[in-house]
Amino acid sequence: MIIYLDLDGVIINWVKGIFNWFEIPYDPSKVTHWDSIQELTNNTKQEFWTKIKFSAFWENLDFYPDSRLFIDRIKKYGEVILLSSPAYGCAGYRQNWIEKNLPEFFNNGHYILTPSKWTCAHKNTILIDDSDENYQKFIQNGGNAIIYPQPWNITREIFKQEMSEQEKNNLVIDTLYLMKNQIRSN
């Protein structure tokens, strides 16, 4: 079984990186939908992406506090491959981040950088991602997927109260356990 693990919004606190980059006081509760960030930074979509197209931004993003433990827990269920959709023109920066922060994945080539995550989907794969679109396309193309709970995706309708990172990780691990057993029995 291959478990594809998204980075931004799952193990990397991309939102905090944005708040820091634009010198906005960090308040993740203000990010309530996918385009919140552009609105909070008072930029058009194009302006926003242009302003973060720098190595200093992408290469210095921080993990969520429990991310390394989360990765170790996921490894118990299959081969973990990082699957990231870097911003246009920033793939090299993402690769540098992986080399610096997750050298075991970098050195073993256990990462894929593509905006078309759905191309990795097949019946023995599970994607863990915070994007509704990536989640849906992965399933539509024959893979299995778990949506990582974040206020900007469909889980906001299910979980009305804010969840801690540990609660999110535990929910994903529990779902991964059930999903792996279901895949095994099919």
Label the predicted regions.
Residues 58-62, 67-98:
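Substrate-recognition element of Asp-dependent hydrolases with the DxDx(T/V) motif
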Residues 126-163, 167-174:
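Acidic, Mg2+-coordinating phosphoryl-transfer loop and its flanking beta/alpha structural elements
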Residues 83-128, 132-137:
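Substrate-recognition "cap/lid" segment bordering the active-site pocket of phosphatases
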Residues 49-56:
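Short glycine/proline- and acidic residue-enriched helix-loop micro-motifs
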